[in-house]
């Protein structure tokens, strides 16, 4: 089963509440069950998120690059089991951060300490569709 990708721009959400908003979206989607011909289909979501504006050191990133990082975070969420959100919070010391390298492999950059990320998990007891 495939899904659609959506971009939500939420300028009124402060940085310190982004994890909470991701958790609320996960819970809201997880609470949805679709009845198709008497078969209950559970719905889940994978989320990538980041604050905007986002800076590397003192240099503000172009919105296109932020969206690219969010997309990469989304795919990290999908590859690590879905029903979760991966968020980019910021970067290590701006002088040693190479954004081109980070954009090649966000997960490696995160694990090597170049990127500050957060993970928000959905309900682990959520019923999963057989092919999720």
For each predicted feature, which ranges?
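Catalytic-core segments of nucleotide cyclases and related cyclic-nucleotide turnover enzymes
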Residues: 52-86, 93, 97-114
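Short glycine- and acidic-residue-rich catalytic loops of nucleotidyl-transferase/cyclase enzymes
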Residues: 1-5
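Heptad-repeat coiled-coil signal-transmission/dimerization helices
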Residues: 22-23, 67
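Catalytic core regions of nucleotide second-messenger enzymes
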Residues: 29-46, 78
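Catalytic strand-loop-helix junctions within cyclic-nucleotide turnover domains
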Residues: 9-18, 37-40, 46-66, 91-92
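N-terminal sensory regulatory modules of PAS/LOV and PAS-like folds
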Residues: 6, 25, 90
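Non-catalytic regulatory/interaction regions at protein termini and inter-domain linkers
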Residues: 104-132
């Amino acid at each position: 089963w495939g899904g659609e990708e959506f971009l939500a721009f939420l300028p009124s959400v402060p940085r310190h509440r982004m994890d909470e908003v991701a958790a609320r979206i996960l819970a809201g989607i997880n609470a949805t069950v679709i009845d198709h011909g008497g078969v209950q289909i559970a719905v889940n979501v994978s989320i990538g998120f980041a604050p905007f504006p986002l800076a590397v050191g003192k240099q503000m990133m172009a919105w296109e690059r932020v969206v690219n990082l969010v997309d990469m975070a989304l795919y990290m969420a999908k590859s690590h089991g879905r029903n979760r959100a991966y968020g980019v919070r910021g970067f290590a010391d701006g002088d040693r951060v190479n954004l081109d390298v980070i954009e090649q492999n966000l997960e490696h950059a995160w694990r090597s300490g170049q990127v500050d990320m957060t993970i928000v998990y959905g309900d682990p007891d959520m019923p999963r569709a057989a092919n999720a």
